[in-house]
Regions:
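Conserved N-terminal beta1-alpha1 strand-loop-helix module at the mouth
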Residues: 1-115
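A short hydrophobic/small-residue beta-strand
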Residues: 87, 137-138
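Active-site-adjacent beta->alpha loops and helix N-cap segments on the catalytic face
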Residues: 92-111, 120-128, 139-150
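Active-site-proximal glycine-rich helix-loop-beta segment
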Residues: 84, 134-135
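Structural loop-to-beta junction motif characteristic of Rossmann-like glycosyltransferase folds
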Residues: 113, 135-136
């Protein structure tokens, strides 16, 4: 198995564990109760050829064990928002990045910008989960098979 395949298998196993606690049907219903998604298109399209910035809340990376200073992801997102990004990306993958859906909740509650959930999405469950936690956008990896949403 490649390292990417291992990461995908880990992401699937983690999603399956969460699904055993909160069934897909209940999560799907929760995702429908979230206020409408904020469109990122207006902020991504610029007429002045300026670079569009997507700020990222991330606790760690595979290279750096700890990105100190992310004690409050919501507060960090507020600082980012003051700089005028088009969106805020929140790394939610718990494995090597120490992200979480709680980080997504905190950022969603803190800013009125489009919020992107950044995780290795391998199941439809994760799509509904991200939306239920307030994500407006979702990062999908082109190396994975297309998801069929249920």
């Amino acid at each position: 198995m490649t390292s990417f395949e291992v990461m995908a298998a880990d992401a699937r196993a983690a999603a399956d564990r969460r699904a055993s606690r909160v069934p897909l049907a209940r999560l799907r219903e929760s995702s429908r109760l979230v206020p409408g998604a904020i469109s990122a298109l207006p902020s991504l399209r610029t007429d002045d050829r300026a670079v569009t910035v997507i700020a990222e809340v991330k606790r760690s990376t595979a290279t750096f064990a700890d990105l100190s200073g992310v004690g409050d992801p919501g507060m960090l997102a507020c600082f980012y928002a003051a700089g005028g990004p088009a969106s805020v990306s929140v790394v939610t993958g718990p494995s090597s990045t120490r992200g979480s859906l709680k980080d997504l909740d905190a950022v969603r509650a803190a800013v009125d910008l489009p919020v992107l959930a950044n995780d290795l999405v391998v199941t439809p469950y994760q799509v509904h989960e991200a939306r239920a936690h307030g994500a407006d956008l979702l990062m999908l990896d082109a190396r994975l098979e297309p998801l069929v949403l249920e």
